Amino acid sequence: MSNNKTKYLVITTFFMAIILLQVLIPWLGYIPLGAVIVGAQPTIIQFTVAIAAILLGARRGAFIGGFWGLLTLWQAWSTPGSIGSLMFQNPFTAFIPRILVGLIIGMAFNKWLRNKNFGFRTLGLGFLGGLAALINTVGVVLLTVIGFTVMRTNFTGIPNHNLLGWLIGIVSFNSIFEIITGIILVAAIGNVLVPIAERAGIKG
């Protein structure tokens, strides 16, 4: 195995370990803003996937997103009994949005931001952070609506009509904070890690 392939393997494994910890230890996977803003608890695992995709490229980013999806599916089936677990028991909902985060963010960075100056790249990284939050949220909502409708899901608390509006109402408040968090985190962390990775020969 070449030295460069070893570097990619080590960094990929490192990001997978981070995501495993974020899934297993809840306070590592979200920012608990509830003490400041009631009900706000933005998830940040999608930004780990986004940063991995920025550093390692779309293919490995999609793989790491798929790993998060696998953990999500496992968690949904191992701890049933809530609407959240019911949503992610559908493998399409668990996998597709997470894979798309890695794929789209990795492709976008390599195509439009890889060789840009610091200022432009900072703005672009912030945009990609917000986009990662949107891809994950919109994907989960749409696939949940499709899954619940096709399977005619009947569960306490799930309405029989206007399922899309109900789901949007649930996620929209948190989504605002996730987008803001993504803009800040991905821009800040990306600007630190991208130059380090590039000096080490890691260029997507």
UniProtKB/Swiss-Prot annotation:
- Give compartment(s): Cell membrane
User: Which keywords label this protein?
Assistant: Cell membrane, Membrane, Transmembrane, Transmembrane helix, Transport
Report the domain of life of the source organism. Answer: Bacteria
Membrane topology, as annotated = Multi-pass membrane protein
In alphabetical order, the GO MF annotations are: transmembrane transporter activity
Functional summary from the UniProt entry: Probable pantothenate-binding protein that interacts with the energy-coupling factor (ECF) ABC-transporter complex. Unlike classic ABC transporters this ECF transporter provides the energy necessary to transport a number of different substrates. The substrates themselves are bound by transmembrane, not extracytoplasmic soluble proteins and transport it into cells. Upon coexpression with its energy-coupling factor (ECF) ABC-transporter complex EcfA1A2T in E.coli allows pantothenate uptake; uptake requires both PanT and EcfA1A2T.
According to UniProt, the name of this protein is Pantothenate transporter PanT
Species of origin reads Leuconostoc mesenteroides subsp. mesenteroides (strain ATCC 8293 / DSM 20343 / BCRC 11652 / CCM 1803 / JCM 6124 / NCDO 523 / NBRC 100496 / NCIMB 8023 / NCTC 12954 / NRRL B-1118 / 37Y)
Q: What is the lineage of its organism?
A: Bacteria, Bacillati, Bacillota, Bacilli, Lactobacillales
